[in-house]
């Protein structure tokens, strides 16, 4: 089994590091002339799949699918399958986090053998990093990845993430825990991955980001474009093994034409190509 890190490394080398997002805001559905329901959601996603077929990895924002109940989850399942059929890795932005058997159930859904299981999933560590163990173990066993929230760009996160625990910030302690998890990952399951299966999320506009030099895994960097992150400034995040700039609104507002969405994404991919 080829691990997530190895698949990601190959995909980024061939297709660049940009991670376009599928964020079907109701406002975007309206702007694209689509109905704000599951039918409009499906049409929106079909356009995105066609536009992003040549990219390494794509990030659907799960909340916008959940809003439509079971019909929305059906669209998400089909979108994940369609992207993977195009050879695109899928990062489900679900931000799951819980404890014990509940975390194990989330792990089965998003990193096990489930129609919702993507190549990787985002997770929240703020019930304690150890609470993520069922998800980390399930991901490695199935050749999938996990991106753990570390330093987000929303102002509400500053008080918690920049709090000092011992002699490091909470955000740095999360990065360090993920680095340790990468070192401990089963070598047989990793199959010689040049990049570990576990990454972190660090916002593009975060001031004084955590030190990523020892992470040994990928870094998802949301907030590029409309949210203020500058593509040319991302190299300052440090010697991370793989930076994945994530962009949604900056690209999606070019729609609804497939060619226009693709062209907007390709322009940004060219701007961050120096990271690959």
Swiss-Prot record:
Family the UniProt entry places it in: Belongs to the OMP decarboxylase family. Type 2 subfamily.
Domain of life: Bacteria
EC number(s) recorded for this UniProt protein: 4.1.1.23
Pathway the protein contributes to: Pyrimidine metabolism; UMP biosynthesis via de novo pathway; UMP from orotate: step 2/2
Listed SMART domains: OMPdecase (SM00934)
Alphabetized PROSITE patterns for the sequence: OMPDECASE
Gene Ontology biological-process annotations: 'de novo' pyrimidine nucleobase biosynthetic process; 'de novo' UMP biosynthetic process
Gene name linked to the record: pyrF
Keywords carried by this UniProt record: Decarboxylase, Lyase, Pyrimidine biosynthesis
UniProt xrefs under Gene3D superfamilies: Aldolase class I
Organism this protein belongs to: Mycolicibacterium smegmatis (strain ATCC 700084 / mc(2)155) (Mycobacterium smegmatis)
Name under which the protein is recorded: Orotidine 5'-phosphate decarboxylase
Residues of the active site: 95
InterPro entries tied to this protein: Aldolase_TIM, OMPdecase_AS, OMPdecase_type-2, OMPdeCOase_dom, RibuloseP-bd_barrel
Chemical reaction(s) catalysed: orotidine 5'-phosphate + H(+) = UMP + CO2
GO molecular function: orotidine-5'-phosphate decarboxylase activity
Pfam families listed in its UniProt record: OMPdecase (PF00215)
